[in-house]
């Protein structure tokens, strides 16, 4: 069931051996970017947010698994690889939470590109 007028959530954080790169949608068309130990609050355009949601639908992000890798590895992992977390909820209440360690869903890089377009960030 979808609930109308839910608080939108766009949150991504990814890190390896360096401090995390994080983007987050705040209230009143504001966004937060944390990268290279810098903290910026920016103004976002409504049309860019709507375009982002269109791309999320096109990419099939709502169908991504909750965890990557989907299967638990047989060997214990070293913790020096890339770890990421994504939280989304559109204005209709459709939500997705997923995370991963050194494993990524299909179209992950395109989704990162769309986050960079929305926030003006440089997540790699």
Give each language-model segment a name.
Residues 21-40:
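Short, flexible N-terminal segments of the mature chain
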Residues 1-15, 42-124:
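Short, well-ordered, aromatic-rich surface patches in folded extracellular/luminal domains
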Residues 15-21:
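Short, thiol/selenol-centered motifs that function as redox-active sites or metal-ligating centers
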């Amino acid at each position: 069931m979808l609930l109308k007028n839910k608080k939108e959530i766009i949150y991504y954080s990814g890190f390896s051996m360096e401090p995390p790169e994080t983007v987050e949608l705040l209230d009143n068309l504001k966004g937060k970017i944390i990268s290279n130990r810098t903290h910026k609050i920016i103004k976002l355009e409504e049309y860019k947010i709507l375009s982002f949601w269109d791309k999320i639908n096109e990419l099939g992000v709502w169908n991504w698994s909750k965890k990557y890798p989907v299967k638990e590895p047989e060997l214990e992992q070293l913790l020096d690889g890339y770890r990421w977390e994504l939280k989304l909820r559109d204005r209709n209440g459709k939500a997705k939470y997923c995370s991963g360690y050194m494993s990524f869903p299909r179209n992950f890089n395109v989704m990162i590109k769309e986050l960079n377009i929305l926030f003006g960030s440089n997540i790699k």
